[in-house]
From Swiss-Prot:
Cited function: The beta subunit is responsible for the synthesis of L-tryptophan from indole and L-serine.
Family note: Belongs to the TrpB family.
Keywords: Amino-acid biosynthesis, Aromatic amino acid biosynthesis, Lyase, Pyridoxal phosphate, Tryptophan biosynthesis
Catalytic reaction list: (1S,2R)-1-C-(indol-3-yl)glycerol 3-phosphate + L-serine = D-glyceraldehyde 3-phosphate + L-tryptophan + H2O
Leading EC class: lyase
Oligomer status and interactors: Tetramer of two alpha and two beta chains.
Gene Ontology cellular component list: cytoplasm
Organism annotation: Nostoc sp. (strain PCC 7120 / SAG 25.82 / UTEX 2576)
NCBIfam families named in the record: trpB (TIGR00263)
GO molecular function: tryptophan synthase activity
Encoding gene, per UniProt annotation: trpB1
Protein name: Tryptophan synthase beta chain 1
Domain of life, per lineage: Bacteria
């Protein structure tokens, strides 16, 4: 664990250059620099603007349904209890209950309000699991903006429900066949579109990745998750959680939960990546576990690379974790040892998916299922009765067909 001054300093990051330590930055074509500058200026102007905040807070309450509940998972807690009844007390931060079924709406809504204020009529986004695409299509429908979503062809097949939802709300979904037809390729295509149409188009990047100011903006718009959690913990037991647990692909749901508590060194921050078919194979997405530092999609971070420094393809049963990079702030938190990152396999995630469904009647997204599955490793290591808050980042409706196919239901 790092010293308190180092942790305190973290809250001021990124620095003026958009860096978290050596990570982050702006590695983009010159044509995008004015747009990134415009976005940062607009964000700095409006984040403290009373009319912007009033509109955002009203919509988060009345349209999204915030605050999302902090739910005590009684039967999951009992499952991991010791014979004497002690053990971890497990709570779920229910982002799955938000409008559209995941945390992604927090960022999409706040960004579309920025896009309106800077005069952009066309919005583009990338999506993997489809939840960010659905959230973006949703807010564009709400505000009458043109919407184009880039999605890998492979992800469109395994997330067909979300493709239909996006189209139903008026979005154009453009299939991306390049590479493996997954999230990395969709992001690359979205950036190409933005370079071409930068004057008229706002790019709602869906995770805490990409060039500055996106990792900062997306984090800040998701920080409401942790802020609500702090208040709810105080209401429920008059204190703080002991452990925060979340899945990590790009890392937006995790940083949304973690950020409020980074300067609380007694709280463990644990991110869970996708080990796919195993970290000893070439089919995984365990970027923080096995990656090396490089540049992808405009930012320096840990990446999955080959010996020549070429980005290699990631694999996960979960479309939202199937990404060979990670947000730069997570790379920084790993390096200063403020957060811990582990990985679980597709098989373990499927077990977590079924476990939460059967014990709590809550069907989690396959992304969330990775965090649920890590309890199997974590709980036996713990002493006493620590309180664990898991970010239930999304619901599993979108994954039911995939899981049914794999498990032969």
């Amino acid at each position: 664990m790092v010293s308190t001054p180092e942790i305190k300093n973290q809250l001021a990051r990124p620095d003026a250059l958009g860096r978290f330590g050596k990570f982050g930055g702006k590695y983009v074509p010159e044509t995008l620099m004015p747009a990134l500058g415009e976005l940062e200026t607009a964000y700095q102007k409006y984040r403290d603007d009373a009319s912007y905040q009033t509109e955002l807070q009203n919509l988060l309450r009345d349209y999204v349904g915030r605050p999302s509940p902090l739910y005590f998972a009684e039967r999951l807690t009992e499952y991991y209890a010791r014979p004497d009844g002690t053990g971890a007390q497990i709570y779920l931060k229910r982002e799955d209950l938000n409008h559209t079924g995941a945390h992604k709406i927090n960022n999409a809504l706040a960004q579309v309000l920025l896009a309106k204020r800077i005069g952009k009529q066309r919005v583009i986004a990338e999506t993997g699991a489809g939840q960010h695409g659905v959230a973006t299509a949703t807010v564009c429908a709400r505000f009458g903006l043109d919407c184009v979503i880039y999605m890998g062809i492979h992800d469109m097949e395994r997330q067909a429900l979300n493709v239909f939802r996006m189209k139903l709300m008026g979005a154009e979904v453009r299939p991306v066949e390049a590479g493996t037809g997954t999230l990395k390729d969709a992001t690359s295509e979205a950036i190409r579109d933005w370079v071409t149409n930068v004057e008229t188009t706002h790019y709602i990047l869906g995770s805490v990745a990409g060039p500055h100011p996106y990792p900062m903006i997306v984090r800040d718009f998701h920080a409401i998750i942790g802020k609500e959690t702090r208040v709810q913990c105080q209401e429920k037991w008059g204190g703080l959680p002991d452990i925060l647990l979340a899945c990590v692909g790009g890392g937006s749901n995790a940083i949304g939960l973690f950020h409020e508590f980074i300067d609380e060194p007694s709280i463990r921050l644990i991110g869970v990546e996708a080990a796919g078919e195993g970290v000893d194979t070439d089919k995984h997405a365990a970027t923080l576990t096995l990656g090396r530092v490089g540049v992808l999609h405009g930012a320096m971070s840990y990446l999955l690379q080959d010996e020549d420094g070429q980005v290699i393809e990631a694999h996960s049963i979960s479309a939202g974790l199937d990404y060979p990079g990670v947000g730069p702030e997570h790379s920084y938190l790993k390096d200063i040892r403020r957060a811990e990152y582990y990985s679980v396999t597709d098989k373990q995630a499927l077990d977590g998916f079924q476990q939460l469904s059967r014990l709590e009647g809550i069907i989690p997204a396959l992304e969330t299922s990775h965090a649920i599955a890590y309890l199997e490793t974590l709980c036996p290591q713990l002493n006493g009765s620590p309180r664990i808050v898991i970010n239930c980042s999304g619901r599993g409706d979108k994954d039911v067909q995939t899981v049914a196919k794999v498990l032969n239901y």
